Amino acid sequence: MDYYERLTAEMAARDRSQPLLLAGDFNIAPSEFDVWNHRYMSKVVSHTPGEVDTLNRLQAAGGFSDVVRDAFPEPQKLASWWSYRAQDFRKSNRGLRLDHLWASPGLTPKVVPGSATIHDTVREWTQPSDHCPITVDLDV
């Protein structure tokens, strides 16, 4: 969590008007709609109250918009990761949204509304990653 604290300080100090896309595997599912079972997962690494609070502070420090959540508002459940342990990830449906695309206030106007996509069909490939690619269109 030290990394996130340092990143939060860095994001708080930067000029929010400058375009920035903060993207990647954050390994934290911030919302009850980003996990398959909120009650169970709140006791498991990746969705504990401390982790969620840390990620929320990072998002607030940079004034970031969550472009994936903007495209798919709550209460829609979202996931970008499924364990290899499940033979059929769709049938077990125990996914987490650990991968994120956040736009700074300087970039948000360039995000094409509704263009964010979680490419979950990649999980159907032979020997795929346990994470799905996420894309968004930018009008630059």
Label the model's feature ranges.
Residues M1-S17:
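A long, amphipathic alpha-helix that forms part
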Residues Y3, L7, L22, E51-T54:
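Amphipathic alpha-helical interface surfaces
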Residues S17-L22, S65-D66:
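Short, structured loop/turn "capping" segments at alpha-beta junctions
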Residues P19, F26, C132:
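Active-site metal-binding loops of divalent metal-dependent hydrolases
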Residues A23-S31:
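Short, well-ordered beta-to-alpha junction loops that form the rim of enzyme active sites
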Residues E32-V140:
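Metal-dependent phosphoester-hydrolase catalytic domains
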